[in-house]
Design a protein with these regions (language model features):
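Basic/polar N-terminal segments that are highly enriched at the extreme N-terminus
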Residues: 1-2
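S-adenosyl-L-methionine-dependent methyltransferase catalytic module, highlighting the catalytic core
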Residues: 5-40, 98, 108, 114, ...
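Conserved SAM-binding loop
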Residues: 46-53, 57-170, 272-277
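Short polybasic linear motifs
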Residues: 283
Length: 283
């Protein structure tokens, strides 16, 4: 039976379904389950798609770029959507097999060097969330490809860290760094050919410009904070299992986010943007 509305409980079921697959390595299983902490982002995206789906009732066609273990796409299929996904890396083949078994058209694609493996004008929505900051190259090529595969009037949903957040400003003010942890970058990743952390983060003005320069009409571009509820939901589950969770910092920052929102201050850690393809989308 198909769900009508994305929920946190529904996402948790999807994460457990993927994490418990015997093809998933044990070290990935814990990471997949722990992603529930920030699961509000995926719920936010899926609810946006649900609220802006086609008026004729046809199931929306969605593509998730940088899908990782494809929990968003698998949940989308459960909701009755047609979902595709792309990613690239050592674990992509395993994730592809698992996601394909749940109805997702998952393809390996290096978006920095290859065209998206789909025809023009196919998708109603493309999700491009928590991906841009990991690129060691300009996102221009990727956004142009997203333009190509969207139908006219289709939308891209972008979520990325806010480089101008109050937290980054305070770190710099007190002599800290806004980059990824130095010890992890310098020592743990010393033998890696490609660094998988954040290469470049963006401000709201930069993200708006990136969408505009690739011929998207910017419908939304605002900052937000991760919701408290998914994090509390995750902590409650882990508390019942007797596990220890060092999550007090995230709880504090999420609570502060509620205050910034009430005061209408653009200080939060994340940017949400929606761009619409107009006309033929040629750039």
């Amino acid at each position: 039976m198909q769900e009508k509305r994305p929920t946190l409980d529904g996402l948790e079921q999807i994460l457990e379904l993927i994490a418990s697959d015997p093809r998933i390595q044990p070290n990935f299983s814990g990471w997949i389950r722990a992603s529930l902490r920030s699961g509000g982002g995926k719920i936010r995206v899926l609810r946006y798609i649900s609220d802006h789906a086609r008026s004729d009732g046809a199931p929306p066609q969605i593509l998730d770029v940088g899908a990782q273990f494809a929990s968003l796409a698998v949940y989308a299929v459960k909701l009755g959507y047609h979902a595709a996904a792309v990613d690239y890396g050592p674990a992509a083949k395993t994730f592809q097999k698992v996601a394909s078994d749940h109805g997702v058209d998952y393809k390996e694609c290096d978006v920095g060097a290859e065209a998206l493996p789909f025809p023009d004008n196919q998708f109603d929505f493309v999700t491009y969330t928590d991906v841009m900051e990991h690129h060691a190259f300009s996102p221009k090529r990727v956004l142009r490809e997203i333009q190509r595969v969207l139908v006219p009037g289709g939308r891209v949903i972008v979520v990325t860290p806010n480089h101008a957040s109050i937290y980054n400003r305070l770190k710099l003010l007190f002599g800290g760094s806004v980059n990824d942890d130095f010890d992890y970058f310098f020592d743990v990743c010393a033998d890696e050919r490609i660094y998988d952390g954040h290469h470049r983060e963006y401000t709201r003005a930069e993200l708006r410009a990136a969408l505009g320069r690739t011929q998207f009409q910017v419908l939304e571009c605002r900052v937000f904070e991760q919701d408290l509820i998914p994090l509390l939901h995750y902590l409650r589950r882990h508390r019942t299992r007797g596990e220890i969770f060092p999550e007090s910092r995230d709880l504090f920052l999420c609570a502060l986010g509620e205050i910034w929102a009430l005061l209408h201050l653009p200080l939060d850690r994340w940017i949400w943007a929606v761009g619409e393809k107009t006309g033929d989308g040629k750039t």
